[in-house]
């Protein structure tokens, strides 16, 4: 399982990526595929530590309308494989992240979600992780909605 700090960092990175790519991507999608290796993961269902290698696919969009409304979107799909220790099980990792930010001046709405499936080959348990965050800030800068969820399951 990816640690909560890793997930929070990924969400922060997603927000920063949206902001940094905004000028270059006005009204366009920026797509990239990035290979990775040695990314730590943990199957908390059986305490396997896994070193995952694979590819991260990202798509970022940014647009504004004449009224000054800004919409940013970040989607990523991570696909990887690894071997768990101490079990020796082969794993397939699939993770999807989605972030949306809608804003006008201080007022904004943010939504982030992640679903990660760590699939063990053989008799070992699979892990599913889901996280969500929803934040709404009104024009006065007051947070009117702030919810988050974190759920794991083994099967």
What feature does the model see in each segment?
Residues 21-27:
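Sec/Tat signal peptide C-region and signal peptidase I cleavage site
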Residues 27-155:
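Beta-strand-enriched cores of mature, soluble protein domains
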Residues 10-21:
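Bacterial N-terminal signal peptides
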Residues 2-12:
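Bacterial N-terminal signal peptides that target proteins for export
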């Amino acid at each position: 399982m990816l640690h909560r700090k890793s997930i929070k960092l990924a969400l922060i990175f997603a927000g920063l990526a949206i902001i940094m790519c905004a000028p270059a991507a006005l009204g366009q999608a920026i797509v990239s595929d990035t290979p990775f290796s040695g990314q730590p993961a943990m199957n908390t269902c059986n305490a396997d530590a896994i070193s995952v290698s694979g590819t991260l696919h990202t798509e970022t969009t940014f647009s504004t309308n004449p009224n000054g409304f800004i919409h940013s979107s970040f989607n990523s799909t991570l696909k990887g494989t690894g071997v768990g220790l101490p079990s020796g099980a082969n794993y397939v990792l699939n993770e999807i992240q989605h972030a949306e930010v809608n804003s006008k001046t201080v007022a904004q709405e943010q939504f982030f979600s992640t679903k990660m499936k760590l699939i063990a080959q053989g008799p070992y348990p699979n892990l599913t992780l889901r996280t969500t965050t929803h934040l709404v800030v009104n024009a006065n800068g007051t947070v009117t909605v702030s919810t988050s969820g974190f759920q794991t399951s083994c099967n």
